[in-house]
């Protein structure tokens, strides 16, 4: 019936259009049937309703994303050499970026945008932090680790696949050392002249938000001799950058005392004036209302909240959350002040986020000018056929 060496996923009639445009996902609603038995994560061929070969990918029976494409080349085998090629292609770009910007830390693999769906690898010095977020990525774990070791023979690898999305793939959470020594409790890295401490084992995501690197640098352009409020500060990257930019004072707000303690250390290890830095453990929504009621004012506010939306059913509620928190920030800014506001929610489009900021300004009774736009750093590329890869967006807004 077929010359395929792999089980075949047959698409429903008319559902091949996205694959012909080289989008890497096949949703469960587009599947007509499976031909042959495939285990979770196993390599399969994907064909149209007439049996025409379209792609080769990984099967995920537990997920709404029923398959993720590894390759659109029928002659390409999915083996250790495949993963080594993908890693080498990605490293070529990151090595150039690292030399250009003086980086020792970057995202080596950004999932679908680097041709490895469900795979995230962040590099912090000689430590590589691995996240395998799909059934296919987990199935190929040994091949991925082998490829990484071949490319970086002396590296240490730590697994941070402790992400809830794995449960949607029918996978258990995983965390721990894979290769080499255990990372220190706080690993020092460098970024645009800053020294920063990263908690690989217990920090958010892989330990640090590398995607905001360029936005942190851009902050310095707005803060000279200004009073700055840094909301959802985590370990203080924006605060350190603001101090390096010559701010008069910066207040960092987060609910985690552990993160604030690291933020304080980050200020100290950079030799910056600790008297200009304040660290407040509080809920940002509540604190902004308190500041508003007390008549507090700031010249620059950084608003970098966590993801508010995980799926489409949460989008409307997330819009209200973004609008509320940005309205409060706008109310706290002096005339001519600048709001640096971000969304890392992939379902939140740039246009929708901009509209939310505009609506927040109307509710605050203020006019705003959009003066600069931000996105994730260049080591987090967005492949043209997978626009969902652009998840981080932000604006610098001048508040009148």
Curated annotation (Swiss-Prot):
Keywords: Cytoplasm, Methyltransferase, RNA-binding, rRNA processing, S-adenosyl-L-methionine, Transferase
Stored PROSITE patterns: PUA
Catalytic activity: cytidine(1962) in 23S rRNA + S-adenosyl-L-methionine = 5-methylcytidine(1962) in 23S rRNA + S-adenosyl-L-homocysteine + H(+)
Protein's UniProt keywords contain Transferase: yes
Keyword S-adenosyl-L-methionine applies: yes
Location of the PUA domain: 6-84
Any one GO CC term of the record: cytoplasm
GO MF term (any one): rRNA (cytosine) methyltransferase activity
Principal location: cytoplasm
E.C. designation(s): 2.1.1.191
Locations listed in the record: Cytoplasm
Protein family according to the UniProt entry: Belongs to the methyltransferase superfamily. RlmI family.
Function: Specifically methylates the cytosine at position 1962 (m5C1962) of 23S rRNA.
NCBIfam families: PRK15128.1
Name of the protein described by the UniProt record: Ribosomal RNA large subunit methyltransferase I
Phylogenetic placement of the source organism: Bacteria, Pseudomonadati, Pseudomonadota, Gammaproteobacteria, Enterobacterales
Gene: rlmI
